[in-house]
């Protein structure tokens, strides 16, 4: 976390702390009314101290910040949004469909990726005429910027895009022994997509993301493969403050 991001997080919690602590001043006959300058300063100082402690605890043990550098998740996430990511989430629960997940990239890249989880282990997956079908059911996806302009299908132990299998030297496609069935996503593997479907470098290009252990194939075979966490809040800029779904 950069100093600027930490300052933003502290300011966010300070604003919340001040907001919940404001109380109407009692009206006393003959009194001038209103808090003194010293009281106001003490209140704000208290808020920033508490906010700082809360922020330090969270970034040490629970959450991290994530800066959005690209438009692959538009409209849900905008370029320069700063998110809070729950690093505990997947220590106690499995990733769920439609979660917005931060994870190490399965291709060489200096930065973690953030995408939406569309397919989980055991799912069948197909994209036809711009519609995503999971386990044979068309998905309702109000979050997508536009319909995907490619055809895709998980079958024959491969991911086929526009009728061609992904190159196993460039994409993470586990060996057949890891698949429970030729048309179902393998154990430990997830199909990730950006909400900005036609401007997103995601699983239709680099194959599956993996949630544990090491990558089983592709250019990062043997490297760490575990989800970093679940994004749950846009906290900066303040005019975009919202919980993520």
Feature map (PLM): residue ranges:
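Soluble "head" domains of membrane/secretory-pathway proteins
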Residues: 2-31, 35-41, 66-67, 75-245
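Transmembrane alpha-helices and immediately adjacent membrane-cytoplasm interface residues
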Residues: 38-67
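Short, basic/aromatic beta-hairpin or loop at an interaction surface
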Residues: 51-62, 72-81, 165
